[in-house]
């Protein structure tokens, strides 16, 4: 194939505020290779850096429960329900899961199919608290990784492993408890390490004994390369060569992550050997190389009959769900949409409904649309942690993913800047998405061929920046939301909040109790007569009476009947018992609360704080211990009103793009603690007003018009109104035809043609240092004749002869009038498809069989994000192998 493209480069760079070097200090020598010295130098209650609160989890790992009556697959039980470790990176390696001002950041939501996450780009002792918090909220353990190279053990790694082998296990266990880290992971494929592996094994056994009683999700992982003798033995299964590394019932040491060439000949004896050792064979994880498409052959179909688990790897810097998220388009929202689709298909099955599980195929897939992919739901149940005592903490979810292009609170817009904090993700539906035409319908025949669908959207939110939308047409369909184990009592208040944007439906909330899971009790939420209103978040509350008093809630579902062209957003589901106390006011660490960055986009800042508590130094203190659900972050420009800028679960926060009226404004930062029922908040603790950081100018320029006619005025300017003045020169055939000075300059040109633009002035680096430069932008200005068309301009607009606002009653008409520019002519204009796919059938173009073809197009790049993978054009054969 031939690809021809004309490239027109703009001079606008990406201006979104994002984390920069120095915002959060992890500390020197905190990599895995120095883990032993990190522990040696730490004492309970001490800090590694002043930014420790960005790395301390404030959510205790939840315990998960089993109830086979609310499973999709009834043949899975505690003995054969596989576990899964995602031994993969999180987000982009530069900032991992630290809070950021970048909307297009990773918000993993399929927690119910993951039992442990090995954060491949985080060291053993330094994992962002936001990621720890959301994983713990879902009952998932998290560990860092020691990436020991596939080579003879180096001196530095040998020193590290020797240090681990001789480490004080009491001190190490206190470290893991305090920071909330749930294990140790080793990419162990080194050799000549016979002198270090035995002490490390001894340490692992002692550590597990210390941690398991206080943290049931604690688990160490060992890549099954390096054996008991410090040499490499790949693809040997569990046997005499690695039994000591694995451990027995008395000394559980690690779980093994098998290399990718496992087969029936290895798995069957490995399961038997694990049982002989008194270990659960589910602690053996069959490795899946997501980058290379392994395992190959017929391996996937071996798994249902083997009592082993699944381990995902791939790759070193980005996980494969995230790396290729531009599959459906390059806009941030389309990449987010594709990422969610890829994960929903991969884990829940290619039809995004675990009831429709295709036959197991022996070909690895993780694309956004892959209806033949069996998904992880073919091997495991969707697990749930929703089982705690409602007297201690309510259950509340707003279906917020943890990122957004804006931030809403109670349905009201608070900021319009992008944000990311995955620690603030709400409880997600247990299944994505279990639709069926009857309650607990478990077969594909129970799913309407043309029924409802659900997806997360970033157009609106009751809380945060996203919500769950249900849409489509159906006669009768259930959406199973949550698998629960809550002991309800009379007086508990259940709230459902939704917004009916379009269409109509009869809608019921359906609840069922343990022992009668298939017998739902319905509570009406909406009648089909309700008029859609895009501005109305409808709140419905139900008080538990004799119907559920003393019963255990097992299932929460929605029943849609007579739905037609439905577009409905879910804003809240909650179960609250009684009233909860307002938390104490946070105490700000003034010395480490500071302004970080200042630019046209606003100001970035950091706040560190602590909560009053009675815990001993070095003892973990969770938000639940201080009667807090999360924290609200405020900013206030001197002389202006306070603004809510975001929320966090950590005892630290980052602010991005705080809006100010002037570049040298003083700003103070505030934080409040929100009660467990989200109904009250503490007083806001405020810092002093602080001087802004050094202003960093934006050197990008712009023209206020794209289509310009002879003698028509246009304005050239810096996009940054604070930028110092420059000299502007318009050049034609090497000669300056017009020039001017200023931050902006308005001029006109009489002759049709293409003109270069030269800008002479200060150009600024990230450090604020100025350098005098002359930049030339080739063919930046194009003057076109009247015959090629012009964009219309409206100079004045009236309604019923008035420029004032008018009010109309139903049936009344209004007379609109305008004065404007004559815009006749023929012109070519680009069409913005908003990342929607546009195409025609190849056969309609005569492209049949193996006929060759060419593709050509003009391409205008408005900007490419630095370090972000960008796809220009992609043609692929679905039968191709990987990597392509």
What are these regions (language model features)?
Residues 17-25, 29, 37, 80, ...:
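Extracytoplasmic low-complexity segments
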Residues 117, 496-498, 795-801, 855-861:
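Short hydrophobic/aromatic patches on beta-strands that form ligand-binding or substrate-lining surfaces
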Residues 602-625, 718:
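Conserved aromatic anchor
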Residues 478-494, 532-533, 549, 662-663, ...:
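Extracellular/lumenal carbohydrate-interaction signature centered on repeated Trp-anchored short motifs
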Residues 787-794, 835-884:
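Extracellular glycan-recognition modules
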Residues 656-682, 755-764:
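Beta-strand-rich modules
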Residues 677-694, 767-781:
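Extracellular fibronectin type III
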Residues 76-269:
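Chitinase-like catalytic core of GlcNAc-active glycosidases
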